[in-house]
Regions:
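Start-transfer (signal-anchor) and selected internal transmembrane alpha helices
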Residues: 1-45, 242-246
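Membrane-interface starts of transmembrane alpha-helices
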Residues: 19, 23, 110-122, 144-152
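Membrane-interface helix-loop-helix junctions at transmembrane boundaries of multi-pass membrane enzymes
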Residues: 232-242
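Membrane-water interface at transmembrane helix exits
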Residues: 35, 39, 70, 105, ...
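Membrane-interface coil-to-helix junctions
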Residues: 34-129, 158-159, 163, 168-173, ...
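Membrane-embedded helix bundles of polyisoprenyl
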Residues: 123-141, 145-230, 243-247
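Periplasmic/ER-lumenal interhelical loops and adjacent helix-loop junctions
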Residues: 250-286
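Alpha-helical transmembrane segments of multipass membrane proteins
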Residues: 30-38, 159, 207, 250-255
């Protein structure tokens, strides 16, 4: 994962692009091996009996909403389906279908007539990128070497909040947060604000179409990057304002187009799914 616009992976001394690629591939391989140990091949391919009737309510919601969305007509907002809660319908962004992948799957279905369960490959992708993204962050802080790549992958793949998210599929995409942190530190430590700001801006907007929880964190990191940019990169306030305006306009446009502002919900679960002192350490039971 060499960021275009950077100087040989970062602005810091590097072992060379080949060594960087090898380190990233190794981190991704470790993640895929762990995924293969924890899940059967059919689960990772999105096929087999597991996906016919998952035991987890969240997964049932993901799958059923995705199927309704794929088989419905094209509408606006883009992710609106009237096959759920007719006649008004609902935007499936609220049903955790991973809107970006759902959009590609719907295009494929309309063109070919074949449905694709993208949740299985998504699990494999998240496991591959979990360690890779953490390595990207560590390299942004100056870490180099093959052994550190292995250590980074193992640490990232051992995080309880990641391992316990497999039943809430979209929140497996924690690599988005880690990559954004890596871009932030490359901007700050390497004094490459403009290049990294563009990449961080794009990542933040893409994350809207994956999960809004992740977007809130990724967008917060991007806001911090812009603040650093404004304070340190003198003479480029206009660029900072342009990037900020693009981010705000892009965010509003995506929220409207995807259906985040469509309809209204209730407060079911408020106060029940709450935060307490054990949650960061034992999130599945607190």
């Amino acid at each position: 994962m060499v960021v275009p616009g950077s100087q040989d992976d970062t602005a810091f001394p590097a072992q060379g692009r080949g060594a960087a690629v090898l380190a990233y591939l190794l981190a991704a391989l470790i993640g895929l091996i762990l995924a293969a140990v924890l899940f059967t091949p059919t689960v990772l391919l999105g096929t087999g009996p597991f996906w016919d009737a998952p035991n987890y309510p969240d997964m049932q919601q993901h799958l059923s909403a995705a199927r309704y969305f794929l088989h419905d007509s094209w509408r606006f907002p883009v992710f609106l389906t009237r096959l759920i809660m007719p006649p008004d319908g609902v935007s499936v962004v609220f049903l955790d279908v991973n809107p970006l992948l759902a959009l590609f799957a719907k295009i494929w279905f309309k063109l070919t007539g074949f449905t694709v369960n993208y949740f299985g490959p998504w699990i494999a992708l998240c496991y591959a990128l979990q360690g890779t993204a953490f390595l990207f962050l560590c390299r942004s802080l100056g870490l180099r070497g093959v052994v550190p790549a292995v250590v980074c992958a193992v640490i990232a793949l051992s995080v309880p909040e990641f391992l316990y998210r497999y039943f809430h599929l979209n929140l497996l995409g924690q690599f988005l947060i880690t990559i954004q942190l890596g871009l932030y530190f490359r901007a700050v430590r390497g004094d490459r604000y403009r290049a990294m700001s563009w990449w961080a801006l794009g990542l933040a907007l893409i994350t809207i179409l994956i999960h809004f929880y992740l977007f809130a964190i990724v967008a917060g990191i991007y806001a911090a990057l812009l603040a650093e940019y404004a304070l340190r990169a003198r003479g480029e306030i206009r660029t900072v304002l342009v990037h900020g305006a693009i981010f705000v306009i892009g965010t509003i446009a995506l929220l409207v187009a995807s259906g985040y502002l469509h309809g209204a919900g209730g407060s079911t679960g408020f106060g029940y799914f709450s935060m307490n002192i054990l949650s960061p350490f034992v999130p599945q039971d607190s």
